[in-house]
Structure formats: structure tokens, C-alpha cells
């Protein structure tokens, strides 16, 4: 595990590595496909940028909609639980006791735990036991959607900038190599965040990227208008 400042950075960056990888793969696939089709530089650059913008907006919109729905669902569950605690506290205590019995506690201990947790914070105890949610920790749709969009855009910029900045015929090959290195890096970061052996995720991500770019490049060749 990483510690200190590096650990804090990794804690923030780590969860968004998959979105960065998505951005790299999506942008690279679009750029390599148009490069395979032999289009001019201006068309390739515009198509890559349009794909990057569309992908960024789509990722953010999907994440926002998903978390917004999750937040609304959790809010409804908390309201329902609060009403039940006010109108039928004994039944709710019995229900909480049975939940802990089903998880392996003896009936006596389960009852004691249920009583103590209810006395401390009844709503939190029941919400966490019954629904796996916390009243004080709710999803933040806008913040998380922006983070997902930023990660996707950051990843997607790399292959697009490679296509923009590298002149002439080598651009597709050089972009291919740059993307493989970037995906290997995201695979390594994911492995480090999970305390896994680093080689397999690196090879897997690079292999997926190579296959995706090869397929889109060949598809571009096959649909070449000329």
C-alpha cells in the first residue's frame, strides 16, 4: 500500500482509473479507425475531438443519472425507515434483532446489539443493517459525474494529442505505441490500488488496447471510400 501524500493522491485518482482507461481506448479507437480509412489530417483531428467531447459528456451524464437515481432511492428508504421507527419501534427492534441472528449472532447477543445500536442512532442502525446505506454518507451525483468526465477526458486527450502533434504517416504507429504504454500504466496503477501482482493487469490492459486499435484500424481500411 502507498502512504502519505502519495497515498492520498492514489486514493483520489485510483477509483477513476477505469474511466481514464475508457477515455484512452475510445479516443484511440476513433483516431486509429479514421487513420486506417486514410482520411485527411483535418478530418481525423475533428473526428477524434468530436468523439472525445461526446464520450466525456456521455460518461458524465450516465454517472449523474445513475447516482441521482441511487440517491433518490436511498432518500425514500430512509424516509420509510424513519416513519417505521416512529410508528412501530418494537417491531423494528425485533426486525433488527432477527437480522443479526441471521448473520450468526446468538439471539441474546443479537438482541443486546440491536438495543444498543438503536439507542445510539436508530435510523443509522436500521438503514445500515437493512439496506447497507448510511444517512450521513449519500452519493454526490454532480461531483462524481464531473470526476468521471474529467478522468475520461484526461485519458482521451492522450491519443488525440498524439494524432494532432505527430506529423505524417508515422502518427498511427506512434499513437499505437503511446496508447499501449498509457494503458500499461493504468493497469499498473489499478494493480497497485488493489495490492495485486502488477504484471497481469498491465499485460491485460495493453492487450485489450492493442486488439481494440487493430480492429478499428482494419475496419477503417475496409470502409475506405477510395
Language-model segments: residues:
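Cytosol/matrix-facing amphipathic helices and coiled-coil assembly/linker segments
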Residues: 1-18, 67-149
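The feature identifies polytopic integral membrane transport proteins across all domains of life
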Residues: 8-19, 41-49, 109, 141-146, ...
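Generic transmembrane alpha-helix signature in multi-pass membrane proteins
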Residues: 15, 25-37, 158-163, 189-191
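C-terminal ends of transmembrane helices
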Residues: 61-68, 134-135, 187-197
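Structural signature of hydrophobic alpha-helical transmembrane segments
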Residues: 169-181
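Interfacial loop-to-transmembrane junctions
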Residues: 185-212
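Juxtamembrane boundary at the C-terminal end of a transmembrane helix
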Residues: 215-226
Amino acid at each position: 500500500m502507498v502512504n502519505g501524500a502519495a497515498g492520498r493522491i492514489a486514493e483520489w485518482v485510483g477509483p477513476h482509473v477505469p474511466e481514464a482507461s475508457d477515455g484512452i481506448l475510445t479516443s484511440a479507437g476513433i483516431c486509429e479507425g479514421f487513420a486506417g480509412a486514410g482520411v485527411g489530417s483535418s478530418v481525423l483531428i475533428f473526428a477524434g475531438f468530436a468523439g472525445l467531447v461526446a464520450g466525456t459528456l456521455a460518461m458524465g451524464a450516465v454517472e449523474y443519472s445513475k447516482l441521482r437515481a441511487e440517491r433518490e432511492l436511498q432518500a425514500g428508504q430512509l424516509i420509510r425507515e424513519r416513519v417505521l421507527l416512529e410508528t412501530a419501534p418494537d417491531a423494528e427492534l425485533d426486525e433488527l434483532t432477527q437480522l443479526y441472528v441471521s448473520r450468526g449472532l446468538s439471539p441474546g447477543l443479537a438482541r443486546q446489539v440491536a438495543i444498543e445500536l438503536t439507542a445510539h442512532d436508530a435510523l443509522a442502525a436500521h438503514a445500515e443493517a437493512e439496506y447497507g446505506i448510511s444517512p450521513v454518507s449519500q452519493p454526490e451525483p454532480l461531483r462524481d459525474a464531473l470526476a468521471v468526465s474529467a478522468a475520461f477526458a484526461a485519458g482521451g486527450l492522450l491519443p488525440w494529442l498524439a494524432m494532432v502533434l505527430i506529423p505524417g504517416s508515422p502518427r498511427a504507429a506512434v499513437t499505437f505505441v503511446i496508447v499501449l504504454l498509457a494503458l500499461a500504466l493504468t493497469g499498473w496503477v489499478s494493480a497497485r490500488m488493489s495490492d495485486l501482482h502488477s504484471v497481469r493487469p498491465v499485460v491485460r490492459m495493453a492487450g485489450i488496447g492493442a486488439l481494440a486499435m487493430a480492429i478499428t484500424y482494419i475496419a477503417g481500411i475496409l470502409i475506405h471510400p477510395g
